[in-house]
Amino acid sequence: MAINRIAHGSLFLTVVLFFLTVNYGEAIWLTIPTTGGTKCVSEEIQSNVVVLADYYVVDEHNPENTPAVSSKVTSPYGNNLHHQENVTHGQFAFTTQEAGNYLACFWIDSSHHLANPITLGVDWKMGIAAKDWDSVAKKEKIEGVELQLRRLEGLVLSIRENLNYIKDREAEMREVSETTNSRVAWFSIMSLGVCVVVVGSQILYLKRYFHKKKLI
């Protein structure tokens, strides 16, 4: 009975981990055109998050002579995090320094003359999915259900951090929206005041003009 409970518990944790890790690791397939086209992928990531990615060219039309691509990864502020040229496969890894949109772009060098577009696979992992759990298990001598519980704990912490990040972003956006609305309201009041002053001055001018001409 105890063994069955452990087995069922292990299966439950495995299923939970599978669904929770979907958003933290994903494989992306890009079709890059041959005529100087660039394909980019982006991800909104908070600060202090580990990001790992492998990319590789898949050419079904010419598997023996795989074409090369160039790649560049930039931070939200435009800092260069990774740059390689003319490779068939590569990898980049970094820890985010600031929250925001991280951009990875891939393109074919114009000197290559290809008849067909190429397919590029990008295995993008971040946060808890990028952690080397085999090394953790060997270092701390844990396995089975205990290891899965440790992974589940890490996932819960990561999800909580993401929720806090979303909450903070929402508060920032709300503050910006309130500030903008306040400025628009003051601008409307000032515009109305200017219109009243202009209309009043026009009325006074016309009144003086008519008095001068003895029309009234």
From Swiss-Prot:
Domain GOLD: from-to ranges: 38-151
Reported function: Involved in vesicular protein trafficking. Mainly functions in the early secretory pathway. Thought to act as cargo receptor at the lumenal side for incorporation of secretory cargo molecules into transport vesicles and to be involved in vesicle coat formation at the cytoplasmic side. Interacts with p24beta2 at endoplasmic reticulum export sites for endoplasmic reticulum exit and coupled transport to the Golgi apparatus. Once in the Golgi, interacts very efficiently with the COPI machinery for retrograde transport back to the endoplasmic reticulum.
Membrane-topology descriptor: Single-pass type I membrane protein
Assembly and oligomerization: Probably oligomerizes with other members of the EMP24/GP25L family. Associates with the COPI vesicle coat (coatomer). Associates with the COPII vesicle coat (coatomer). Interacts with p24beta2.
Entry protein name: Transmembrane emp24 domain-containing protein p24delta5
Coiled-coil segments: 137-159
A single GO BP: vesicle-mediated transport
InterPro entries for this protein: Emp24-like, GOLD_dom
Domain-related comment: The cytoplasmic C-terminal domain contains a functional dilysine-retrieval motif, which is involved in the retrograde Golgi-to-ER transport of the protein.
Main location: endoplasmic reticulum
UniProt modified residues of type Omega-N-methylated arginine: R169, R174
Residues in compartment: Cytoplasmic: 205-216
Transmembrane segments: 184-204
Lumenal side: 28-183
Protein's organism: Arabidopsis thaliana
Annotated family: Belongs to the EMP24/GP25L family.
Motif COPII vesicle coat-binding: where in chain: 209-210
Motif (COPI vesicle coat-binding): 209-216
Matches recorded under SMART domains: EMP24_GP25L (SM01190)
PANTHER family: TRANSMEMBRANE EMP24 DOMAIN-CONTAINING PROTEIN
Record-level GO cellular component terms: cis-Golgi network; COPII-coated ER to Golgi transport vesicle; endoplasmic reticulum; endoplasmic reticulum membrane
Subcellular location, record wording: Endoplasmic reticulum membrane
Signal peptide: 1-27
Keywords: Coiled coil, Endoplasmic reticulum, ER-Golgi transport, Glycoprotein, Membrane, Methylation, Protein transport, Signal, Transmembrane, Transmembrane helix, Transport
Glycosylated position list: N86
